[in-house]
């Protein structure tokens, strides 16, 4: 097995000062901007009381501790796939053991993608709305839209230049959070007693809101403090476990100090209903302008992190056959830097709709959190299987741990569902549409693979040999290349044989069959060459990690160069005139695009799935583009795909 390129992960896996700074800039944008709206959402329109604020602070403290620190930082970060994290990386680790786990992986991935639509609007809106302190008539929506549109427009150029400033800016942001919070805690350290979980218990069981609802429903607002926890796991490959864990100590302290500082400020208004945002309320008047600027920059960085995470999520889904083929661009040579135009447009349209539909950040709070809550639950399910089967931890310990988190996350989900008619419907519908696309694509792919007919390639060697030497047939190409999905190297799809011999006899000097195996390791790039029939049939098996772009044209040329240098096969043209010049000859790829034939008897569900599959395939990019093939050397052939052939029938001839 030969290696195409270095397959090691190039992330910042070691603990370094640079790695810590990069972690601040890449990972903590979402969870780091939560203080902009969490305490505001908890206080809501309720009369301020110690039961409400201390109970809310207690819930925030224990949510961050249990969900973010213990579940993600301590436990889930250990479930890395060769240094990579995220829900699809976790699924790739266990998919061979239980393929059915693809369902929670798809649901969780779709929900996380939907969360990427709501994060930029609520983060940027919360920051920009600080301007209302100076003038309540300032139109914030145009400002928010301008920032979001500009953010999405620069994606195609990459984020290398501005990315260098993300870490320092987020360091300033967290330092500001801690300083502002500490300024309010001075002389009000009594609020720290909220660390006692009894305050949280009393809020959830005894408190009644202004709407005569149980305090339990405030969990929907509390959950906003941990919505960025999944990013710690998703961006594991960029920063490394040591850098994330150490930097989290600083981030968690800054967040908690700010939350408790806001709580102390709010309690100064005991007996009243507060107006405005307590985040800006704890700022000295002279600092508000600077605070708004820093908050806006932090919100932009949070949005950028979510956008980049969405690109990575889709690129992984593409390799795992969970998403229609879309064009992926690489604006820089830096590993992990990618740009997906269709997803960029989808997210931009979604963000603009959210801003125009909801208007204010307070109205968006109802839509925020529900989707990522679903991702949390799906990650818990996958994590349980990983701990049991891969790590072989005792069933009792895993059962108790997962039961605790299922209770916590289901409680959050129930509370978040209460916000369905206040914006939650948007994220549920968005998640549902994205999950539907993934499920249709995956289901159709399974149907196609299950019903694809394979034949023994050795049975056709004599015919291939004769065709290659038959000078009465015009030579189609010197080298003819087919992509095959046959895992067994002794087999080939019957459609390939149909293309070579029946559709139009294709004479060539050498027939190549390329097979791509997407492996669980993220950055593997290896290949194996098998000479099936000397000087006539060669098969190449590529083993590519699920994060590797399928640049088959480039990879194939690399293999050819290696084989020529090793003198494994004679590639010089068999045309006499070209052979004198030592010319290798031409290469032509044949891509077979299957279409649904009329000769089928599909079930209702299969017909539904295949109809949607071909619709999605029609609006996605072609197979040749997806595999990075040079269109000038590609022939696309349409071949019928007979699914569930109709039963035999009798046709009577009359005279």
From Swiss-Prot:
Q: Where in the cell is it found?
A: Cell inner membrane
Q: Which UniProt keywords apply?
A: Cell inner membrane, Cell membrane, Ion transport, Membrane, Potassium, Potassium transport, Symport, Transmembrane, Transmembrane helix, Transport
Q: Which residues form a coiled coil?
A: none
What is this entry's stated membrane topology? Multi-pass membrane protein
Q: Which GO terms describe its cellular component?
A: plasma membrane
Annotated HAMAP family: Kup (MF_01522)
Family assignment?
Belongs to the HAK/KUP transporter (TC 2.A.72) family.
| Protein name (database record) | Probable potassium transport system protein Kup
| Record organism | Cytophaga hutchinsonii (strain ATCC 33406 / DSM 1761 / CIP 103989 / NBRC 15051 / NCIMB 9469 / D465)
List the top taxonomic levels of the source. Bacteria, Pseudomonadati, Bacteroidota, Cytophagia, Cytophagales
